[in-house]
Design a protein with these regions (language model features):
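Generic structural signal for hydrophobic
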Residues: 2, 32-33, 101
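Alpha-helical scaffold elements lining the catalytic groove of polysaccharide deacetylases
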Residues: 15-39, 45-73, 90-93
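C-terminal active-site subregion of NodB/CE4 polysaccharide deacetylases
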Residues: 52-167
């Protein structure tokens, strides 16, 4: 049995580790969250940059998500792209990657977009830009959030600064 170093380390440190038992516990948490109104989305299995990977890599990654996560969350038709990427520019979705994801059951596509408003509603999909609200954004670009709240009033002065820049 060959496995990634990280998973192998878990087995070494916890010889009674049971993936089935962990999945059972995760499903209970997901079910409780859904009962409270939470919705779940894919962020891809391996935090993939869908704008840069090939179709075959996207297919393999999506299948891993569907095999390992969908059974826990009951499936999802929402995908939130990592790395601020998208399937294309502002034009309508098209191409092999879109057709594959659409065929895999996704209807809602979200990218990370710092603009104040971006929604594209089409017959086959709903596309929305979203803004990340995190310490990095609040520290380096508070002006991008000023229409939502006053960053100075919520940024904890005890928080260690400066926030490390991303590479």
């Amino acid at each position: 049995l060959r496995m990634s170093r990280g998973l192998g380390d878990v087995y070494k440190r916890q010889p009674d580790f049971s993936l089935a038992k962990e999945r059972e516990g995760a499903k209970k948490v997901a079910d409780a969250m859904k009962a409270e109104g939470w919705l779940f989305a894919s962020h891809t299995w391996g935090h993939q940059n869908v704008g840069q990977i090939g179709l075959e890599t996207l297919q393999t990654d999506t299948q891993k998500f569907k095999d390992n996560v969908d059974p826990l969350i009951g499936g999802t038709d929402i995908i939130i792209f990592a790395f601020g990427t998208d399937l294309c520019g502002p034009e309508d979705y098209h191409g092999d990657k879109f057709e594959y994801l659409k065929g895999a059951g996704y209807n809602y596509f979200c990218n990370v977009d710092s603009s104040k408003y971006y929604v594209q509603i089409r017959e086959r999909y709903f596309r929305q830009g979203r803004r990340n609200l995190d310490g990095y954004r609040m520290y380096y670009h508070p002006e991008l959030l000023e229409d939502l709240f006053d960053v100075k009033s919520v940024f904890d002065p005890v928080r260690p600064t400066p926030v490390p820049p991303m590479a």
